[in-house]
Every structure is written in structure tokens, then in C-alpha cells.
């Protein structure tokens, strides 16, 4: 396994997923679900999923996700965009599932919270490029640890209300 390739593949989804939280600092936020409920009577995604967060996640993931490739040339801008946008989509899917399971916003849901963004990013990206299975397995192993650590840092920085 080429560790440089591995880390440059997981970097855009990590950045996209981690940077969307900065939208919480904005004064005006617009929920992706417009405050509407699904057919089960519960919110579709919840207040924590906003258009601003989606835009920040995709833009930051694409730009910062591509940036190291100016040196290493592993993925292109399109690749960084696909990985970032699909990571944000995966996070939305995770929020949708959590709402269906009656979990409130911020409630921990292992391994859904830790892997939804990454597995969706890899699934969508694999429609365009081949991803070695060993990369997916390695990412599944290390992501929960990295996710927990970065969430704790975001909590300490008061970007998140919960440390998970």
C-alpha cells in the first residue's frame, strides 16, 4: 500500500466532513431540509445540516483536498471535488438515517457518524476510479480514531457542542 496515495485519497473527504462545522459560526444558516419533516413526521436532516455547511464542506474539501497534489500529483481537482461532494452527501445520508432512528442532533451513532462520509465518498469515487480494497479497509480501521480525535478538538475549540 502506497501511504502517500492512501492519505491523499482520504484527505478530501476528511476535510469536507470536518470543515462543514464552520458553518455553525455563521449568523444565518439555512437548513437543507427547509425545516420540513419526512413522511414519518420527523425532520428530514435537522437544523445541523445547512446549505452553508454543504457549500463550505465541498469548497474546502475540494481546494484543500487538492492542494497537496500540487506536489504529489495523485488526484486531480475533479477527483477532489467528487470525493468532497460525495463525503458531504454521505454525511447527509447519515443524518437522514439518524432521524429515522429517532436520534436527536448530536447523538452519537457509532459507526454511522464515523464512516458515512468516507464510505459514500469511496463508493461514488469508485464509479470513476478504482480504489484498492486495502485502502478502503485501512480507512475503515483508522477513521473512527481520527474522527473521534478531531471531533474532540472541535469541541475544545467550541465548534461542536458534543465531543463525539
UniProtKB/Swiss-Prot annotation:
EC class: transferase
Cellular localisation: Cell membrane
Record's keyword terms, sorted: Cell membrane, Lipid biosynthesis, Lipid metabolism, Magnesium, Membrane, Phospholipid biosynthesis, Phospholipid metabolism, Transferase, Transmembrane, Transmembrane helix
Chain ranges passing through the membrane: 3-23, 55-75, 77-97, 122-142
Coiled-coil boundaries: none
Coarse class of the protein's main subcellular location: membrane
Keyword Transport tagged: no
Top-rank taxon, per record: Archaea
Membrane-topology descriptor: Multi-pass membrane protein
Cofactor (UniProt): Mg(2+)
Pfam annotation, one family: CarS-like
One Gene Ontology biological process: glycerophospholipid biosynthetic process
Catalysed reactions listed for this entry: 2,3-bis-O-(geranylgeranyl)-sn-glycerol 1-phosphate + CTP + H(+) = CDP-2,3-bis-O-(geranylgeranyl)-sn-glycerol + diphosphate
GO CC terms in record: plasma membrane
Metabolic or biological pathway: Membrane lipid metabolism; glycerophospholipid metabolism
Single GO term (MF): CDP-2,3-bis-(O-geranylgeranyl)-sn-glycerol synthase activity
E.C. number: 2.7.7.67
Similarity comment text for this entry: Belongs to the CDP-archaeol synthase family.
Job of this protein: Catalyzes the formation of CDP-2,3-bis-(O-geranylgeranyl)-sn-glycerol (CDP-archaeol) from 2,3-bis-(O-geranylgeranyl)-sn-glycerol 1-phosphate (DGGGP) and CTP. This reaction is the third ether-bond-formation step in the biosynthesis of archaeal membrane lipids.
UniProt xrefs under NCBIfam families: PRK04032.1
Record's protein name: CDP-archaeol synthase
Organism of derivation: Pyrobaculum aerophilum (strain ATCC 51768 / DSM 7523 / JCM 9630 / CIP 104966 / NBRC 100827 / IM2)
Amino acid at each position: 500500500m502506497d501511504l502517500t496515495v492512501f492519505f491523499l485519497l482520504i484527505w478530501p473527504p476528511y476535510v469536507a466532513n470536518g470543515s462543514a462545522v464552520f458553518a455553525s459560526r455563521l449568523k444565518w444558516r439555512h437548513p437543507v431540509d427547509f425545516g420540513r419533516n419526512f413522511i414519518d413526521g420527523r425532520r428530514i436532516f435537522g437544523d445541523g445540516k445547512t446549505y452553508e455547511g454543504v457549500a463550505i464542506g465541498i469548497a474546502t474539501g475540494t481546494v484543500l483536498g487538492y492542494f497537496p497534489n500540487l506536489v504529489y500529483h495523485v488526484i486531480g481537482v475533479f477527483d477532489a471535488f467528487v470525493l468532497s461532494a460525495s463525503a458531504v452527501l454521505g454525511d447527509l445520508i447519515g443524518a437522514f438515517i439518524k432521524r429515522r432512528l429517532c436520534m436527536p442532533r448530536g447523538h452519537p451513532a457509532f459507526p454511522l457518524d464515523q464512516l458515512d462520509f468516507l464510505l459514500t465518498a469511496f463508493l461514488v469515487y469508485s464509479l470513476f476510479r478504482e480504489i484498492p480494497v486495502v485502502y478502503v479497509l485501512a480507512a475503515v480501521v483508522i477513521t473512527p480514531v481520527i474522527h473521534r480525535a478531531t471531533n474532540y478538538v472541535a469541541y475544545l475549540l467550541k465548534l461542536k457542542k458534543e465531543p463525539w
